[in-house]
Amino acid sequence: MAGRKGGRAKRRKVCFFTSNGITRIDYKDVDLLKRFVSERGKILPRRVTGTSAKYQRKLTVAIKRARQMALLPYVGE
């Protein structure tokens, strides 16, 4: 049979912001932003985090603003 070769079934990721009722993403909330940045300092994509497109755009802007204000590093440690 040419199908799935056994393994884990894919689980649908849920948007963190929608499920927790967060409507505004503040660039000064560094603890929240760090959850969506890799250890190398790169912004994690939607397919990894499960964030909706609307909040991914807001998240990207907030992370870039936080980097500009030196609240987040451009590269990881």
UniProtKB/Swiss-Prot annotation:
InterPro entries with a match to the protein in the record: Ribosomal_bS18 (IPR001648), Ribosomal_bS18_CS (IPR018275), Ribosomal_bS18_sf (IPR036870)
UniProt keyword annotation of rRNA-binding present: yes
Gene Ontology MF annotations: small ribosomal subunit rRNA binding; structural constituent of ribosome
Pfam family, one: Ribosomal_S18
One GO biological process term: translation
Keyword RNA-binding: yes
A GO-annotated cellular component: cytosolic small ribosomal subunit
Keywords: Ribonucleoprotein, Ribosomal protein, RNA-binding, rRNA-binding
Function text: Binds as a heterodimer with protein bS6 to the central domain of the 16S rRNA, where it helps stabilize the platform of the 30S subunit.
Family: Belongs to the bacterial ribosomal protein bS18 family.
Quaternary data: Part of the 30S ribosomal subunit. Forms a tight heterodimer with protein bS6.
HAMAP family: Ribosomal_bS18
The name this protein goes by in its record: Small ribosomal subunit protein bS18
The species this protein was found in: Bacillus anthracis
Gene: rpsR
